[in-house]
Amino acid sequence: TVLGSSSEGNAYVLQNAGEALLLEAGIPFKKVLAALGNNVKKIVGCLITHEHGDHAGRINEVLNYVVPVYASKGTIEAAKINSCWRPTHIRMENGSYQHLRLGGFTIIPFPTKHDSREPLGFYVWHEETGGVLFATDTFYLPCTFAGLNNILIECNYDPDILERNVTEGYIPEVLKERVRRSHLSYYTCLDALKANDLTPVSYTHLTLPTN
């Protein structure tokens, strides 16, 4: 379920009848709870990709409901956390991030490429939902996965439209360069989709001025 997917705020839910896994904390947590019938006990955890406000801006609200939150060490250090509850640091083990088991969900974190401290993407598997690839805010997808049932992937901008918006004065050159260095273009997204075995695909984090 997509609850928010833009620079205004990102939040997604993978769920079955008994469990829910949150991806990102970028919208008011009350909206997340409303989507889950106000059943906070159904939530087995929340995964955060990086510290930017549209992805982690509501992290304290999630923590205050005593929902387990998981993120990289760099993300936790950079996020503005003032809750008395703390996120769990996803550790590196022998050059790879540790795998997580949250309820019936198995999570494999992997590094992504963004202008943040230590961004991650996640492969999530559940017996009822199969394999889901979640990757957002990255200019390149370094990993491939087989047997995917769903892909939630960033598709942020069209390079030609981005260049035209600079020429016409709609956005500054510095913003263009930041977008190119930290977000996934249409064409790079297509390359990533071709490299992965997939069924349904959902595009996330579409940005209005660059599409």
Mark where each language-model region is:
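Conserved small/polar residues in nucleotide/adenosyl-binding loops
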Residues: T204-T210
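Catalytic core of the metallo-beta-lactamase
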Residues: Q98-E154
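Terminal, non-globular segments
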Residues: A192-L193, L198-T199, N211
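Active-site metal-binding motif and surrounding structural segment of the metallo-beta-lactamase
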Residues: P28-G74
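Glycine/small-residue-rich loop that forms an oxyanion/phosphate-binding "nest" at active or ligand-binding sites
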Residues: Y70-L100, F105-F110
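Conserved beta-strand hairpin/beta-sheet module of binuclear metal-dependent hydrolase folds
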Residues: T1-N38, L120-D137, N150
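Active-site neighborhood of phospho(di)ester-bond hydrolases with catalytic His/Asp-centered motifs
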Residues: L23-G26, V44-E51, Y70-K73, L133-D137, ...
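A short acidic, glycine-rich active-site loop
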Residues: E173-L184
